[in-house]
Design a protein with these regions (language model features):
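Catalytic core of pol beta-like nucleotidyltransferases
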Residues: 1-48, 57-63, 74-129
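Short beta-strand->loop micro-motif that forms the acidic, two-metal-ion catalytic signature
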Residues: 68-72
C-alpha cells in the first residue's frame, strides 16, 4: 500500500471498527486500497480524490451499514454514466466483502464550490482514501 495513503486508510479502518461494522480493520484497508487502485486504473489522472463519508467515516455505523465513497473527478461528471462505468467494480467488491459500497460522483469544481448539506458534511467529516 502507498505509504501516503496509510494514515487515511488507518483512520477509515478505525472509524469502521468504532462504528461496530463487521469488517476487520485489515479487510477494510484492503477494500479501500483495492477500490482506489481500480478507480485509478479506470480514470487515470482524471481521478482527483476518494473520500469515505457517512456513518462509517463518523464512526457511528451499525452492523450492515454501507460504505459511502465520494468519487471526485476532473472535468464534467455525468453521475449515471460513471455509475455504469464503475458498477461492476463496486458490485463485485461488495459481493466479495459482504458489504454494500455506494459511490457518489462529483466534479472537482463542484466539490470545491457546492454548498449542499452533503458536500459540507463530506468536507467536514470525510476521510480521504
Amino acid at each position: 500500500m502507498d505509504t501516503d495513503l496509510a494514515p487515511s486508510v488507518e483512520k477509515a479502518a478505525a472509524a469502521l471498527k468504532a462504528g461496530g461494522a463487521r469488517e476487520p480493520g485489515e479487510q477494510l484497508r484492503s477494500l479501500l486500497s483495492e477500490l482506489r487502485s481500480r478507480f485509478e486504473a479506470l480514470y487515470g489522472p482524471r481521478l482527483v480524490r476518494l473520500m469515505l463519508f457517512g456513518s462509517q467515516a463518523r464512526g457511528d455505523a451499525e452492523p450492515g451499514s454501507d460504505i459511502d465513497v465520494l468519487v471526485v473527478l476532473e472535468g464534467p461528471v455525468r453521475p449515471g454514466k460513471e455509475i455504469a462505468r464503475t458498477g461492476e467494480i463496486a458490485a463485485g467488491m461488495s459481493l466479495e466483502n459482504n458489504v454494500v459500497i455506494s459511490c457518489t460522483f462529483i466534479s472537482a469544481d463542484q466539490f470545491e464550490r457546492e454548498e449542499s448539506p452533503l458536500m459540507i458534511n463530506v468536507r467536514r467529516e470525510g476521510v480521504p482514501v
